[in-house]
């Protein structure tokens, strides 16, 4: 089911997050994750439309191979597909930011050794994917430090509403895609 996280009147100066759950491996609260995505985009001062989709293991593996070639025969946790190339859009037309695709089953598998809980892991992946849409990366140590600081800030402000829980870690598996 696809649904915007909040009603829209087509105003290009607002944030619209369209959410979809295309998997049945892990229960997903679309409104919760759509609201987190909206909060992050608003905090980053970005307007436009973002799609946030939750898919199964087979689908994310297929997307990874299709878009990144033979990058290993394993699923990843999150993929980001930016659409906005920085070109101006016509008046009255919202900017299409891109698509963030999260695999809750992979999040569930890696959560105990990473973020701690499944919810913390999914929250981190949503924020991580959005930051990639906005042009942030973690290819160098400096980029990684900046990206993790932004992730922590957004999670503290909009998800935990305070400090990170015990057991939360930013250390990611080496094979996890962006």
PLM regions with names:
Residues 121-122, 129:
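Pseudouridine synthase
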Residues 1-121, 134-178:
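An acidic/histidine-cluster motif and surrounding catalytic segment
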Residues 127, 131-135:
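Short active-site segment of divalent metal-dependent hydrolases/proteases
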């Amino acid at each position: 089911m696809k649904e915007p996280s909040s009603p829209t009147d087509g105003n290009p100066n607002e944030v619209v997050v369209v959410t979809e759950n295309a998997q049945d491996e892990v229960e997903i609260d679309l409104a919760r994750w759509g609201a987190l995505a909206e909060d992050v985009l608003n905090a980053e001062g970005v307007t436009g439309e973002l799609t946030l989709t939750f898919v199964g293991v087979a689908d994310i593996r297929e997307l990874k191979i299709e878009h990144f070639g033979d990058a290993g025969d394993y699923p990843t946790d999150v993929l980001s597909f930016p659409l906005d190339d920085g070109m101006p859009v016509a008046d009255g037309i919202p900017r299409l930011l891109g698509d963030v695709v999260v695999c809750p089953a992979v999040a569930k598998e890696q959560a105990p050794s990473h973020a701690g809980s499944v919810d913390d892991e999914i929250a981190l992946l949503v924020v991580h994917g959005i930051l990639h849409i906005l042009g942030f990366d973690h290819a160098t140590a400096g980029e990684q430090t900046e990206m993790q600081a932004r992730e922590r800030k957004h999670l503290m402000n909009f998800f935990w509403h305070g400090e990170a829980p015990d057991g939360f870690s930013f250390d990611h598996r080496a094979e996890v895609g962006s």
